[in-house]
């Protein structure tokens, strides 16, 4: 089907849905039609803008052929033609991007997990830096950042930390952060001034609701035990810590941050649900498009995606060859938008090649 025919078909569908909604339908039929109509609004607006520019270009070209036009009028028409011809490719690209298959998870909130990797205590300190960076970014975006669990080293580092980030389209912005983040810097304890390299792993999961993932009680094994602090000593006398295992998948979540067993269980279930949902998403994505495995956003957690070089003051994203020489703004202030927007644009460009 030609591109123009496809656009006409979408406009017809949108008009038919509008007529259907105006006809007084009710119940499930109304809900379904309303949802479809709302989903088409954005792409229809872009199609109409594209068609309008095409129509205006055709009119301008026809007008230019008329006999007896003075030079001033002819120059004005040629300027208009030039402007329209330059705008059409951009408008067409906007339509194609709007037509790309949507990731159902993009509109969801997210759970972010940061774990210290290779590099000992320096890796744990870097994990804490990353976790705080995402907290700053969430604040800049007006999202709600709720710490779920932190396992600290006692001297400022995090063995692992997780948080729930709530807001509109959070997952669509943060999903490209999944992977291995590497840091190069001189540790405070390094007397010779040598640069050390360490790493931390980031996992970003769409926060799943109960309607997304139904977890049966019979599929869960719940163990309770006493919470322990640094060095392994017990920090309370009740079995407040919780370990939940999802038997069908083998996915396990353990939490002991809260003094209440009930609160630990609720948080653990939230993380568990997100991990199961993400696992199902990954399987479906692989089945649907094996050809996209190596592309940005594959979510490969073993892939080294970004390096933070403190002596040089730079942050480099290896997937899109983007380097910014403003490490403090990125790390301390959470100014991640340049990376986020570039990664989204790159992902869209690669998807467009598949159309």
Curated annotation (Swiss-Prot):
SUPFAM superfamilies: Release factor (SSF75620). Residues 280-306 are annotated as: Disordered. GO terms for cellular component: cytoplasm. Its main location: cytoplasm. One of its GO terms (molecular function) is translation release factor activity, codon specific. Methylated by PrmC. Methylation increases the termination efficiency of RF1. Keywords: Cytoplasm, Methylation, Protein biosynthesis. This is Peptide chain release factor 1. It comes from Rickettsia africae (strain ESF-5).
